[in-house]
Amino acid sequence: MDSQRTLLVLLLALVSFLLFQQWQVAKNPAPQAVEQAQTSSTLPAPSFADELDPAPAQQASAKLITVTTDVLTLSIDTVGGDVVAADLNQYSAELNSANAFELLRDTQGHQFIAQSGLVGPQGIDLSSNNRPSYQVSADSFTLADDQNELRIPMTYQANGLEYTKTFILKRGSYAIDVEFDVINKSGNNATLGMYAHLRQNLMDAGGSITMPTYRGGAYSTEDTRYKKYSFEDMQDRNLSLTLTNGQGWAAMIQHYFAAAWIPRNEPGANLYTRVIGNMGDIGVRMPNKTIADGDSAHFTATLWAGPKLQDQMAEVAPNLDLVVDYGWLWFIAKPLHWLLSVIQSFVGNWGVAIICLTFIVRGAMYPLTKAQYTSMAKMRMLQPKLQAMRERIGDDRQRMSQEMMELYKKEKVNPLGGCLPLILQMPIFIALYWALMESVELRHSPFILWIHDLSAQDPYFILPLLMGGSMFLIQKMSPTTVTDPMQQKIMTFMPVMFTFFFLWFPSGLVLYWLVSNIVTLIQQSLIYKALEKKGLHTK
């Protein structure tokens, strides 16, 4: 029995070590630009790669306009109308920094931009070095206090066609509608279609073999709710998928934040990736429309550029909220995040919410915990009989196993009963780890006193040391029948090893584990008192 518990504790330690590796990668990412030979590819109709000059886009021109809302500050290049910078006004770059987090940017060393345009026979974005120079009414646009919507129209004329590209931003929203209106006065039919993609330097996504982090592409279609498509995948093979019903999106995601293009009412759109030099594109090419002389056409797509806020993203597009990737334990992590958010809405502090969540989870598991300690106590009571049985039977393992099972059945003892709560707690622990790791709400969220960021490690290691001390107390209070010296050393070393791993874990996760241990000490005391009355435990 105690050997099984030792094995489970070792397994939990291994899980903690793997999570520790993952946290180190997430905390200290080291992306490296990946050089790639220039690539040209052909995609099924509509063939985007054949329509747009594959030369890498030049750095943003000096003709930029600034668009500011309560949550976003955008820089839009009037040449092509690309979004070349996006600052998230309500998210600081670093803790206590006055600078906003830059999601999109176009600098000498790094490019991550959102491009959109019109291609096809009468398209105006067929060459990356000869894109339209739009006219705008001002150099800056700001959402006024009495406004809920801000519209920025940009106009261009060529060959008898009038083009208007409009950016529409709304208060409190990270979703940006991008619309094209084309009026044909050329005297002939005009055929063109819209494209929208994200372009970023190819990077090493980082991570470990066991539990990798992720920075790269992702997409959704009618048949695939959510799938990652890494920079390495892009280099191996260009993606080309048809959105039969027009439902889907293409995204570039990273820790806490994402950018995505969502086509609107465009059945038959083509979702694609391309590699150009050391740049990777992922986006959507909408079907062509033929505009008769004197007629007009309308094209639209939505750009999400912001934090991974699940509720808002789910409203913008189906499955867009799945970029908050909880891994294979999502069915546990998602309800935990929901419950944590509900609690926080009442208590107003994410640290207090974690404490409350811990009490709820451990309270729900109390019947199992009680059964565990009762089973362990009964097993200890059977030790004299088991020892006598070993002396009587000797080395006959088959007979020993048979008589042990008969004894367990007679005494109504489940030898695995003490392991069940530990087995159940491991997936909850892992799911909560991912819930805390993926929750942008915890980023730079303070708790009390010295804890200013629950998503970062404790700067003074106070919580990990308290957690290690609580594990030591639990160990001292727990009776054991372990006689093997090696197992005794392993169990004694466990608090030290866990403390070491947890030194660099997010303080929110360490807080959960510390409070969970405190609850264990309380429950343990109550259960032992009840067992003493039944004669199953002695101090």
From Swiss-Prot:
Keywords: Cell inner membrane, Cell membrane, Chaperone, Membrane, Protein transport, Transmembrane, Transmembrane helix, Transport
Lipid bilayer topology: Multi-pass membrane protein
GO cellular component: plasma membrane
Keyword field contains rRNA processing: no
Taxonomic lineage from the root: Bacteria, Pseudomonadati, Pseudomonadota, Gammaproteobacteria, Vibrionales
Ranges that cross the membrane: 6-26, 341-361, 416-436, 454-474, 495-515
Main location: membrane
Name of this chain's protein: Membrane protein insertase YidC
An example Gene Ontology molecular-function term: membrane insertase activity
Keyword Cytoplasm: no
Protein family according to the UniProt entry: Belongs to the OXA1/ALB3/YidC family. Type 1 subfamily.
